[in-house]
Amino acid sequence: VDRLLKSPAKQRGRDFGVILACFRDEGYTVEWRVINAAEYGYQQRRRRIFIFGYKNDTKYAKDVLKKAEYDDAFENAEKACKMEKVILKDGFFAKTFPVNKAENAKKVMKELPIEVGEVSEKFNCSFENSGIMKDGTIYTLKTIPYYHGKQITLGDVMETGRVDEQYFIPEEKLYYTNPDITHSNEIENKLPKESRQTWQYLKGAKKLLRTSANGHEYVFSEGAISMIDQEDKPARTMLTSEGGFSRTTHIVKDKETGKIRLLTATETERIQGFPTDHTKYCLVKGETV
């Protein structure tokens, strides 16, 4: 996931720096890009970091660097210019997922320590969402997607016909009070169990007392998220807890009845980019079941 670029919190960029150093020691050039699928028209706001490495002695590596007019003998300023060209125009990601340089984009150029152990102990770097590493030299800058095509939304992948009753949420499980209430404060008075087992409570903002493992009492708080997912936007990132009683589970308004329900299996398949009924059949000992 994209937080790899910033981990750990006490030594920003160390973990990704170790990965890059290992690739460097094996003779690879590495490009990376944080890509949100929805920013290129897909039906899910799923953000992940993609890493592509290629051996320095391959034809592919030589072709990329030739197009960018890169030379190992360049001074840092010239190297930075050519490495930026790889990121924006000539590199692996640039052709399939085009980007522009962000306005007032922050740029970072840095050398990896020679020893991987030193990277682990001392290295830190403010990695941006795009970058390249060659021979231990890192160049990274913030980019923005360049896409003007069709945008698939959650509404586009929702079923339009009759949906099985098992997916609909009973009214008493939706709300415990006025539907306009989006927060709860349980610091002084805890809500009844029945209220806490509603989607309104789960997705709403809340404050409540908790006790840590060492006995320290503290206030836990979290903000509200949208109760009903909007059909005119791509779906949120779908997790393995989808469909369960979870804060991250999608809730939608059924297109035929207008009632509130969970996503169907078919809709979750579509959000993940699979064909309709992808999981309906499978092969067992050569037979379709």
Predicted features, each with a name:
Residues 1-54:
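Conserved Class I SAM-dependent methyltransferase catalytic core
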Residues 3, 58-59, 245:
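Glycine-rich nucleotide phosphate-binding loop and flanking beta-alpha elements
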Residues 6-9, 62-63, 249-250:
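Short glycine-/acidic-enriched loop or helix-start segments at secondary-structure transitions
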Residues 11, 59-75, 79-80, 255-259, ...:
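Intrinsically disordered, low-complexity coil segments
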Residues 22, 80, 126, 190, ...:
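Residues that form generic nucleotide/phosphate-binding pockets
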Residues 42-144, 151:
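Flexible, glycine-/basic-rich loop-and-beta segments that form/coincide
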Residues 130-289:
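C-terminal target-recognition/interaction regions appended to catalytic cores
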